[in-house]
Amino acid sequence: TSSMDIKERCPYVYADTECLYDNSLDDCLIRLHNDECDGVITQADILRLYKYNHMKDYIYDYIPTSIYVPETGEAMSAVLTSTDADIIDMVSRVSDENAVKCINIESDTIQRLNVRGYMQMTRAMASIEDDVLRVDACIYNHDKSLHRSNSGDVNSPKTVITNLVSDIISKI
């Protein structure tokens, strides 16, 4: 895990859990890969940085802020695991709806952009505030990059994504 606060709160979230604090998510992922631990708890922002580049073989889900709020008021945390689906199943049942929506929207945006076939790398980040959905996407193609964003009603994610993808496609 990447936060001492998480280590201190971990036993309250999961009964009979022993936590080991580590400053490096890379080291935690190595331990997880080598079956030295059952899961990794980290900040959601850190998870997002690793999501597209380093975590191809891991399952993850978010812990809702209603049961796990660091004193610093930072973003909700996430649990990663490579083998123990029980951890993810448990977290999924209580997961924050907006976090799950954002993950699905990000994945859909990336998939729609990558289907074009000429992007080297595509990244997307969705956020929901009140009733507004904002999706940012950045594509990289050889020596060029393009960043665009689109906002709209949280109840119309397909429209927001379609408009964003159309905008990007028209610019490349």
Predicted feature locations:
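Small-molecule-sensing regulatory modules
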Residues: K7-D16, L20-I172
